[in-house]
A protein has these predicted regions:
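Active-site phosphate/pyrophosphate-binding segments
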Residues: 7-45, 157-253, 332-337
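Glycine-rich phosphate-binding loops that contact phosphosugars or nucleotide phosphates
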Residues: 38-181, 195, 260-286
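A generic structural motif
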Residues: 76-79, 227-238, 284-293
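A short acidic, often aromatic-flanked loop/helix-cap motif at beta-alpha or helix-coil junctions
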Residues: 140-145, 237-239, 292-297
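Active-site-proximal catalytic alpha-helix in oxidoreductases
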Residues: 147-155, 196-198, 210, 215, ...
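C-terminal active-site/capping subdomain that shapes the small-molecule cofactor and substrate pocket
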Residues: 243-325
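Short, small/acidic-rich helices and loops at N termini and domain boundaries
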Residues: 320-337
Length: 337
């Protein structure tokens, strides 16, 4: 039985459990590899990642992970059209899990009108009908639970396009499985962290390549737990956010610092001081860090863990982590207007 056959699409905890295995499901076809080889034959000025919600976050992870390795810009678009500076020397990677995301379809039409080089990642829908160079992915699971599928695909396509060494996702998956065995030992059990958020508001704080992890964690609390959450980036948050919490509001916050193994000295100092300032306010900040790991391992191990935290919080809040009723209603009304 393969990984996808083991997954229950109506059980979010089950889907999160299979996070590591989902990193290894997709193989890039010879046809797409050939297209990427053609793209490489000409100058590549930049890569633009297009998507919304769970389909966009794979681009953000790729952008932050590769930002210190590449000499070209990586840009994420969450909108109906592409910036004017994205021309035919860029590669546009459009991701829509359902294939029917209206903003992404609009951006694809915009790219086609401008004769841009595109790669589409989707399971079905309009994107697969009108797009060129489509990478087909399985459509069985919830879009936000499909993040490992989407990210491994987006990163691999980027590496192939730029002749970068391909990431060994089998090794990364094995690392994540070993990390999950440490939940309740090195890391608190996810239910323990979720209980800290019950009737409180999580504030995820990160810097550098862990910023998209904080953003993803915030979104997972919103969608899975039906619960408010926020995220912020150091150093920017030191110039505004730390003044934003009056005592009556601050007591409702639970700051969670996502720490990395490669923090620059000035960032390390800022995070330490920010932690102390929150302690001075009477808060109880939490620190999460994956020791002895490479950046990508840190990013994905924290993501896997925090995904499970969001599911446990949903259970505590008596929320259905699978349903997204308001998002569905908004889409229904948009389709009518």
């Amino acid at each position: 039985m393969d990984t996808l056959e083991k997954i229950n699409p109506q059980d979010m905890k089950n889907m999160v459990t299979f996070f590591p295995e989902l990193l290894n499901v997709i193989e890039i076809s010879p046809q797409i590899k050939s297209v990427l080889k053609e793209f490489r034959a000409e100058d590549i000025k930049g890569i633009c990642y297009v998507g919304m919600g769970g389909s966009s976050i794979a681009g953000s992870y790729t952008q932050y992970y590769l930002s210190d390795k590449l000499k070209i810009p990586l840009h994420v678009v969450r909108n109906y059209s592409l910036p004017k500076y994205v021309d035919n020397k860029w590669i546009v990677i459009l991701t829509s899990y359902s294939g029917n995301t209206e903003e992404t379809i609009s951006s694809l039409r915009n790219a086609m009108d401008r004769n841009l080089r595109t790669i589409c990642i989707s399971s079905n829908g309009k994107i697969t009908e009108i797009g060129k160079n489509v990478v087909a992915i399985p459509g069985k699971i919830q879009p936000r639970a499909a993040f490992p599928l989407l990210f491994s695909t987006v990163l691999t396509i980027t590496e192939l396009a730029l002749s970068e060494k391909n990431t060994d996702f089998s090794r990364v998956a094995d690392f994540l499985k070993e990390q999950a065995k440490l939940w309740g030992k090195v890391f608190p059990e996810p239910i323990e962290v979720a209980s800290l958020f019950h009737h409180k508001i999580p504030l995820y704080i990160a810097s550098g390549y862990l910023v998209p992890v904080a953003y993803r964690a915030k979104c997972q609390i919103n969608e899975n737990s039906k619960h408010p959450a926020f995220y912020s980036e150091i150093p920017e948050a030191n110039h505004n956010e730390i003044e934003g919490f009056a005592d009556s509001i601050a007591k409702e916050l639970v700051p969670i610092f996502l720490r990395g193994n490669n923090e620059k000295q000035e960032i390390l100092k800022r995070i330490d001081i920010t932690y102390d300032l929150y302690k001075d306010m009477g808060l109880n900040p939490l620190v999460l860090k994956v020791d002895d790991a490479e950046p990508l391992e840190e990013m994905l191990a924290l993501t896997h863990y925090l995904d499970m935290v969001s599911v446990e919080l949903a259970f505590l809040d008596k929320a259905n982590p699978v349903s997204v009723d308001r998002i569905s209603e908004l889409k229904r009304r948009m389709a009518q207007s």
